[in-house]
Amino acid sequence: MNKILKGDEVIVLTGRDKGKRGKIAVRVDEDHVLVDGVNVVKKHVRPNPLKGTTGGIVDKTMPIHQSNVAIYNPASGKADRVGIKLLADGKKVRVFKSSGEEIKA
């Protein structure tokens, strides 16, 4: 079970975007995520007449390693760690480590 999922609000812990918050848009692979408005770079794109695209400079969101983000706890207003709790019926749920409160998906 992944501890950080698509749609979670996260805080960036390291890098030039440290402290920024955003929602996870996509899990690129097992270790990388795309966070809305974070790690945006300028990409130079060549024109392609076959596809009908014009060239120029485009803002593009790049992946960030999931170890560099932490889930945002709205109760405390800070970054928090995620734990897995086993319920009585055998279901696994994600909880905030600091409060033990269940994370709403």
From Swiss-Prot:
Q: Which NCBIfam families match?
A: rplX_bact
Q: Which HAMAP family match?
A: Ribosomal_uL24_B
Please give one Gene Ontology molecular function term for this protein: structural constituent of ribosome
Q: Is rRNA-binding one of the keywords UniProt gives this record?
A: yes
Q: Which UniProt keywords apply?
A: Ribonucleoprotein, Ribosomal protein, RNA-binding, rRNA-binding
Function, as annotated, reads:
One of two assembly initiator proteins, it binds directly to the 5'-end of the 23S rRNA, where it nucleates assembly of the 50S subunit. One of the proteins that surrounds the polypeptide exit tunnel on the outside of the subunit.
Q: What GO biological process terms are annotated to this protein in UniProt?
A: translation
What is the protein name given in its UniProt record? Large ribosomal subunit protein uL24
The protein's assembly and partners: Part of the 50S ribosomal subunit.
**What Pfam families does the record tag this protein with?**
ribosomal_L24
May I have one GO cellular component term? ribonucleoprotein complex
Family classification: Belongs to the universal ribosomal protein uL24 family.
Organism of origin is Leptothrix cholodnii (strain ATCC 51168 / LMG 8142 / SP-6) (Leptothrix discophora (strain SP-6))
